[in-house]
């Protein structure tokens, strides 16, 4: 087949232009480099309201596959992780985890509880979404709820994911938020916030977890609270 030289030149221009546009739109600026996350270990209180710290609680933590490990800290999935247990005045224990990563692009993404619990041998089911009100007049936090079970351990979980300044729990939502930041040339940071309980019914667990989240957010300064709520 004979190729028209003019068409070949035009096709080359289009291909080169598309490649150049793709490179120009590639996110380059780390949000974490310009908007530092708080030191979670210090800003999250060890005692607040009716809650006090319970040591040596065995939490299921997000895994970090060896394939993702890099020498550069900015390329690690999580650069901060706080895992604690808290008990209220009645002795009810809540397990609390926050994992923060400075790079939340398509290659390095937050590990959902479904993933890390599944890797630990749990069966995860009964997923649902809920709106959590933590302050009058403030937009509610969209959270996900699942139940993890392993042998006799029954663990209802409430969690949410932040990508940049947005709460985005669904796969499509996270893709859209990352695209929004990508069009601005920004690589967003992100965080996983998780609360769970063992030894209570599903309804009792979620009620206790909601109370814990409400009390924790109320104990934080407005600036630190925004890290959790977006």
What would you call each of these model-derived segments?
Residues 4-23, 30, 130-230:
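A short, solvent-exposed beta-edge/loop patch
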Residues 26-45:
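Alpha-helical transmembrane signal-anchor/signal-peptide segments
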Residues 42-61:
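Amphipathic alpha-helical segments
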Residues 43-44, 78, 185, 208:
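Generic detector of ordered secondary-structure context
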Residues 49, 92, 189-191:
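A generic secondary-structure signal marking the coil-to-beta-strand transition
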Residues 55-181:
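Short, solvent-exposed recognition patches
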């Amino acid at each position: 087949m004979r190729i028209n030289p003019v068409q070949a030149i035009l096709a080359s221009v289009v291909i080169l232009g598309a490649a150049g546009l793709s490179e120009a739109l590639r996110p380059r600026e780390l949000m974490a480099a310009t908007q530092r996350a708080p030191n979670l270990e210090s800003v999250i209180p060890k005692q607040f309201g009716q809650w006090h710290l319970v040591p040596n609680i065995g939490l299921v933590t997000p895994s970090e596959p060896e394939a993702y490990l890099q020498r550069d800290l900015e390329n690690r999935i999580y650069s901060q992780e706080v895992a604690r247990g808290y008990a209220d005045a009645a002795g009810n224990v809540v397990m609390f985890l926050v994992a923060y990563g400075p790079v939340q692009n398509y290659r390095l993404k937050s590990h959902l509880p479904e993933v890390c619990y599944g890797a630990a041998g749990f069966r995860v089911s009964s997923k649902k979404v809920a709106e959590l009100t933590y302050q009058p007049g403030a937009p509610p936090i969209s959270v996900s709820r699942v139940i993890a079970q392993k042998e006799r351990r029954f663990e209802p979980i409430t969690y949410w994911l932040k990508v940049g300044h947005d709460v985005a729990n669904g796969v499509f939502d996270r893709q859209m938020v990352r695209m929004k930041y990508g069009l601005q040339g920004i690589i967003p940071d992100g965080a996983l916030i998780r609360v769970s309980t063992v030894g209570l019914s599903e309804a009792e667990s979620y009620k206790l977890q909601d109370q814990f989240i409400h009390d924790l957010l109320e104990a934080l300064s407005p600036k630190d609270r925004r890290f959790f709520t977006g």
